[in-house]
Structure formats: structure tokens, C-alpha cells
Swiss-Prot record:
Binds 1 copper ion per subunit. It is an enzyme of class 1 (oxidoreductase). Its cofactor is Cu(2+). Residues 272-301 are annotated as: Disordered. One of its GO terms (cellular component) is extracellular region. Keywords: Carbohydrate metabolism, Cellulose degradation, Copper, Disulfide bond, Metal-binding, Monooxygenase, Oxidoreductase, Polysaccharide degradation, Secreted, Signal. O2 binds at H180, Q189. Cu(2+) binds at H21, H99, Y191. This is AA9 family lytic polysaccharide monooxygenase J. It is found in: Secreted. It comes from Neurospora crassa (strain ATCC 24698 / 74-OR23-1A / CBS 708.71 / DSM 1257 / FGSC 987). The keyword Lyase does not apply.
Length: 344
């Protein structure tokens, strides 16, 4: 009887933990909603736990997509996380289950963001929202954390792009580290997605870089830590944030797009690859078309195309629904998420 009860309890905890898993899915650029058009969406909402594996770069099973989101140096992108694919509701926590830990953003300059695998180039950190002591808190669980800020801001986190960042293609690596089981080696959970962006109007900064895998070790104090005890100090893993980047104080509240952006304000005439629908080919970063119908209104079906494997439908989704040639919008996790899959 006891063994049966243990099995039931273990299964219940596993289900609860799985439900609490999450994915960085959408990207906003200066308040414009690009949905998942330039995101290498992970195949599931499960975490990466082996920091020495290839999966720590951009998550398991991901590959390049055709879409690239245009970003201006000095501008702001907003990464967006939710537990289930395609669910952008603020009713549920972005990442549940008391998955407290830091949120960090890295960039890697590449020749072509749609094909680079992220393992050959160097990475540098441009943003960190890690930890701060909460007055009256007893243990680390009670403190302020980056993932707690994600929950408070409907899964959104504003990230400033350094104004002196050189122009060109980049992979933007968004990482949320959950520390609820990190008291033992291999217990930390990394939730990672890579976005493909093209930066324009940049400068000439030259940043020191690290490589993934290699930048983290399972025994790093920011990775192996018991947050169910008193936490007197916490330093997030990896290098320091580069000059021109941002270190946000955990618990400082929602700002900018985190609190004001409305789902559905997506570009109405940006084709896959981030090029203007008019077909401009001068090599410069594209201009972003004004959202159709005003702020908060969805793009009209057919007004823009969704890149291969990008989101094209689902509960609360109001972006583009027409897939690129050779792809059809198919339900992957109904009713939450549909994506453009090869037409069979």
C-alpha cells in the first residue's frame, strides 16, 4: 500500500512539474508584436538539464527558420514566455511551480541567423534579471527572482539592445534558469529559446565572448544551489553583462512593453526573412510596416506569411495565419498551438 501511494505521489509531482514547464515563444521589437516568426521554437516545453550538451545552445531539436526580426541598435526587444505553446493569456503564470531563478539574454553575431547553429560563434550577455533579497523573506524561495518578474509581467521581459552593437545578423538566446531542484548536481532546469534578428544602425563595439556549451558548469554556484534555505548572495552563471547592456534589479516591477503591449499588434507586411513585402533588396535592414487596423488589432489573414514551423494559430493567437509556400497550418497542441508544417 505504501509503495502504491509513493508511485501515485511521484507521478503527481511529475505531472505538476511538467505543467509548470515553459517556453520563450514570442518576440516584440520596440512594441511591435512579431509573434514566433523569428523564433527557433523548441519541440516541447521541457527544460535542458545537461549544461555540457549541445542542447544548451538553443534547446533540443531546434533548427533555423526563414524569419528574421529587424532590430535597431539601441532599441528594445521583449521576449515572451508562457507555459503552453501558443497560450498568451495572462491568467496563468508564465512559468509556474515556484520555478524561481534568473532570466538572462545573450547575443551571438553570425553571418546568417537563419542557418547558424550557434556553436561556432561566441556569445556575450546583454541582460540579466537575477536575484535580490526580499525584506521579511525567510528563505530563497521568498526572494525576488527574474522568473518571478516574468510572472508579474505576463511572461514579458524588456531587453535593451546595446546602441554600439555592430550591425548584422545575430542569434538572441533567451534563458530562464529554474532552481527549485538545483540543490543537487544536474537538478537545475534551463528554459532556452533562440530568436533570429538582424540589427541595423549599429556601432563598432567588440565584446569578449564565451561558448555554449562551455560557459557553464553544473557545479557553478549560480547553478547548483539550494534556494529552499537562506540565500545571502546570488550571482547568476556566465560572464558579466557587457557595457551597454542592462542588469535589472529583481523585483523592480514591470516597465515599457512588459506592461503596455497588446497581443495582435504584429507587422502587416513583413515577409519571411524580415524583408519588406515590396521586395526591397538594398541589403539594409527593412522598415517595419505599421500594424494593420491600429494598435491591438490582428493582422488580416493573407496580409503576411508565417515562416516554416512558425505559429499560425491557437487559443489567444491573433497574428498571421497564412503559411509560406509549401507549408500548411496544422494543429500541434490543440487548442493552444498550430504551426506551419510541410504540406503532405
Amino acid at each position: 500500500m505504501k509503495s502504491s501511494l509513493l508511485v501515485v505521489l511521484t507521478a503527481g509531482l511529475a505531472v505538476r512539474d511538467a505543467i509548470a514547464h515553459a517556453i520563450f515563444q514570442q518576440l516584440w521589437v520596440d512594441g511591435v508584436d512579431y509573434g514566433s516568426t523569428c523564433n527557433r521554437l523548441p519541440t516541447s516545453n521541457s527544460p535542458v538539464t545537461n549544461v555540457g550538451s549541445r542542447d544548451v545552445v538553443c534547446n533540443a531539436g531546434t533548427r533555423g527558420v526563414s524569419g528574421k526580426c529587424p532590430v535597431k541598435a539601441g532599441g528594445t526587444v521583449t521576449v515572451e514566455m508562457h507555459q503552453q505553446p501558443g497560450d498568451r493569456s495572462c491568467k496563468s503564470e508564465a512559468i509556474g511551480g515556484a520555478h524561481w531563478g534568473p532570466v538572462q539574454i545573450y547575443l551571438s553575431k553570425v553571418s546568417d541567423a537563419s542557418t547558424a547553429d550557434g556553436s561556432s560563434g561566441g556569445w556575450f550577455k546583454i541582460f540579466s534579471d537575477a536575484w535580490s533579497k526580499k525584506s521579511g523573506g525567510r528563505v530563497g524561495d521568498d526572494d525576488n527572482w527574474g522568473t518571478r518578474d516574468l510572472n508579474a509581467c505576463c511572461g514579458r521581459m524588456d531587453v535593451l539592445i546595446p546602441k554600439d552593437l555592430p550591425s548584422g545578423d545575430y542569434l538572441l538566446r533567451a534563458e530562464a534558469l529554474a532552481l527549485h531542484t538545483a540543490g543537487q548536481s544536474g537538478g537545475a532546469q534551463f528554459y532556452i529559446s533562440c530568436y533570429q534578428i538582424t540589427v541595423s544602425g549599429g556601432g563598432s563595439a567588440n565584446y569578449a565572448t564565451v561558448k555554449f556549451p562551455g560557459a557553464y558548469r553544473a557545479s557553478d554556484p549560480g547553478i547548483q544551489i539550494n534556494i529552499h534555505a537562506v540565500v545571502s548572495n546570488y550571482v547568476a552563471p556566465g560572464p558579466a553583462v557587457v557595457a551597454g547592456g542592462v542588469t535589472k534589479q529583481a523585483g523592480s516591477g514591470c516597465i515599457g512593453c512588459e506592461s503596455t503591449c497588446k497581443v495582435g499588434s504584429s507587422p502587416s507586411a513583413v515577409a519571411p526573412g524580415g524583408k519588406p513585402a515590396s521586395g526591397g533588396s538594398d541589403g539594409n535592414a527593412p522598415e517595419v510596416a505599421e500594424p494593420s487596423g491600429g494598435e491591438g488589432s490582428p493582422s488580416a489573414p493573407g496580409a503576411c506569411e508565417v515562416a516554416a514551423y512558425g505559429q499560425c494559430g491557437g487559443d489567444q493567437y491573433s497574428g498571421c495565419t497564412q503559411c509560406a509556400s509549401g507549408y500548411t497550418c496544422k494543429a500541434v497542441s490543440p487548442p493552444y498551438y498550430s504551426q506551419c508544417a510541410p504540406t503532405s
